[in-house]
Curated annotation (Swiss-Prot):
GO-annotated biological processes: defense response to bacterium; defense response to fungus; killing of cells of another organism
Subcellular location: Secreted
Protein name from the UniProt record: Myticin-B
Coiled coil: none
Propeptide, chain numbering: 61-96
Cellular component per GO, a single term: extracellular region
Location, primary (coarse class): secreted
Tissue-level expression: Hemocytes.
Keyword Signal appears in the UniProt entry: yes
Organism: Mytilus galloprovincialis
Phylogenetic classification of the source organism: Eukaryota, Metazoa, Spiralia, Lophotrochozoa, Mollusca
Signal peptide span: 1-20
Keywords associated with the record: Antibiotic, Antimicrobial, Disulfide bond, Fungicide, Secreted, Signal
InterPro entries documented for this protein: Myticin_preproprotein (IPR019631)
Length: 96
């Protein structure tokens, strides 16, 4: 019983720290997750030094010729200085 209550508290804390936003992503870093497809729904994870933005749903880009392009994978993204700093932050959080 106590273990179940503890698990419920841990899940509640995690969910409370994540906010989902149904509007178009305005963050440059968050939009990079989707590449050219764009982000239609994103979330922000609260961290001790700010928020980490991540995309929950990438839209598809429709071209006038009828072709569609799926969202880019993380391996195809540009390795920008912002992404380097976020990776360093992620590695630092893993050490804790």
């Amino acid at each position: 019983m106590k273990a179940t209550m503890l698990l419920a508290v841990v899940v509640a804390v995690f969910v409370a720290g994540t906010e989902a936003h149904p509007h178009v992503c305005t963050s440059y870093y968050c939009s990079k997750f989707c590449g050219t497809a764009g982000c239609t729904r994103y979330g922000c994870r609260n961290l001790h030094r700010g928020k980490l933005c991540f995309c929950l749903h990438c839209s598809r880009v429709k071209f006038p010729f009828g072709a569609t392009q799926d969202a880019k994978s993380m391996n195809e993204l540009e390795y920008t200085p912002i992404m380097k700093s976020m990776e360093n932050l992620d590695n630092g959080m893993d050490m804790l």
